[in-house]
Design a protein with these regions (language model features):
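Short, low-complexity disordered leader/linker segments with a strong preference
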Residues: 1-32, 98, 385
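Beta-alpha junction/loop-to-helix N-cap segments that form part of ligand/metal-binding clefts
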Residues: 24-25, 30, 45-52, 67-142, ...
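Extracytoplasmic "Venus flytrap"
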Residues: 34-55, 80-86, 108-111, 175-183, ...
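Short, polar/charged alpha-helical segment
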Residues: 46-69, 188-195
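Extracellular/periplasmic Venus flytrap/periplasmic-binding protein
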Residues: 91, 134-136, 143-250, 287-297
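Periplasmic-binding protein-like
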Residues: 96-108, 128-130, 171-176, 226-235, ...
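Extracellular/periplasmic periplasmic-binding protein-like sensory domains
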Residues: 243-318, 334, 374-385
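Segments of small-molecule ligand-sensing domains
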Residues: 301-314, 323-380
């Protein structure tokens, strides 16, 4: 039977359309991001903060409908509990490697971050820590190790300068919890005091541990030296009870510390011993007026979603996920081997500030934000550079 040309063309077009409709849409490409942080123990509130921040980023990325290599991406979060323990951290790292994650946001504690970083490096999986500050982490020479916070060198030096220059401290006591984070930070602070050469000096150096609850022995020794400032290298779970015992012993010294103490939980942990302008602490990152609105909006979204305020690290975890996504888009691939060069060269304006990495994986031009506590609230004082 003869079919007119126009009819034949129409039938062909209809058949082609039917065939196209019959073809299933390309399956979404799953990109799995792991988080590793303490979800149990005394640091669980900080570790959950990291997971929550990363999850917000994952949801935002899925809402964008990002396409790589012609396939829509499905972003998936795999959170793991490292219990702030080096051995558990190493086991978690291997679990994430075996799960074939494309990237890892973690760990929180320096003591878990360093051993885990070797496992990620051997597997070629990029890692961005939203919290670990020990210089050792990025001094190992691993091309997969990055962080979006300042390291102890900057934090310790900056806090020493502030304690001497602004708080006018002459006699300073130093305590650390013997963890990689706490000891490293305290050592750098002590070096900063010595380097200042302004007549200020460390008059007492004491040690505790990250699970301690009784500090009377070391605080009694410190009280005998009548310091102006006590520097503590460690986390809020220890700093809170320590402040209570400082008050009970009549210690008038101000407490200075790093980001581990700069949490929203400190008022609960320290009670009325927190006082006003008694505690000074810094967190990594520093946003100017132009970026302040973005950070405030993130904090408000977090509060609305989780019915609690940001502790410390959620914005850094959020930025870490977004930095990974930006590098993958630049490389048009979620394969770690392909996007790693783009990650090393990334430039990103995040909620915590400008992010770019130096050859070691540290932040370029890192800034710190100084806080104190007044009437049970954390109050921003200034950005330090």
């Amino acid at each position: 039977m003869h079919i007119p040309a126009i009819a034949a063309v129409s039938l062909f077009a209809l058949a082609a359309a039917s065939s196209a409709q019959a073809q299933p849409a390309a399956k979404a490409l799953q990109v799995k991001i792991g988080t590793a942080s303490p979800l149990s123990g005394t640091g669980a509130h900080q570790g959950k903060d990291i997971e929550n921040g990363a999850r917000m980023a994952i949801d935002d990325l899925n809402a964008k409908g990002i396409v790589l290599g012609g396939r829509k991406l499905q972003w998936v979060l795999q959170p793991e509990d490292d219990a702030a323990d080096p051995k558990t951290g190493a086991a978690v790292a291997q679990k994430l490697v075996d799960a074939k994650v494309a990237a890892v946001v973690g760990h929180l504690n320096s003591g878990t971050t360093v051993p885990a970083s070797k496992i990620y490096a051997n597997a070629g999986i990029p890692q961005i820590s939203p919290a670990a500050t020990t210089p050792l982490y990025t001094n190992q020479g691993f091309k997969t190790a990055f962080r979006v916070v300042a390291n102890d060198n900057l934090v310790g030096r900056t806090l020493a300068t502030y304690a001497i220059g602004t708080l006018k401290a002459k006699k300073i006591a130093v305590i650390d919890d013997r963890t990689a984070f706490g000891q490293g930070l305290a050592d750098e602070f002590a070096k900063g005091v010595k380097k200042a050469g302004s007549g200020a000096a460390v008059v007492s150096r004491q040690f505790t541990n990250d699970k301690a609850t009784d500090f009377n022995a070391i605080l009694t020794q410190i009280r005998a030296r009548d310091p102006d400032v006590i520097f503590y290298g460690g986390m809020d779970a220890v700093a809170g009870p320590m402040l209570k015992q400082m008050k009970a012993l009549g210690l008038r010294a101000k407490l200075v510390s790093g980001d581990g103490v700069c949490s929203e939980k400190m008022p609960l942990l320290a009670g009325d011993a927190l006082g006003d302008d008694k505690v000074y602490c810094v967190v990594a990152g520093g946003v100017g007026p132009a970026q302040e609105a973005g950070l405030n909006a993130f904090n408000a979204r977090y509060q609305q979603r989780y019915k609690m305020p940001v502790q410390t690290y959620a914005p850094y975890a959020y930025d870490a996920v977004m930095v990974f996504a930006k590098a993958m888009q630049a490389a048009n691939s979620s394969d770690p081997a392909k996007y790693l060069p783009a990650l090393a060269a990334v430039k990103h304006e995040g909620v915590t500030g400008s992010i770019a990495f130096d050859p070691k994986g540290d932040l370029r031009n890192a800034a710190l934000t100084l806080y104190t506590f007044r009437k049970g609230q954390k109050v921003k004082l200034q950005v330090l550079r």
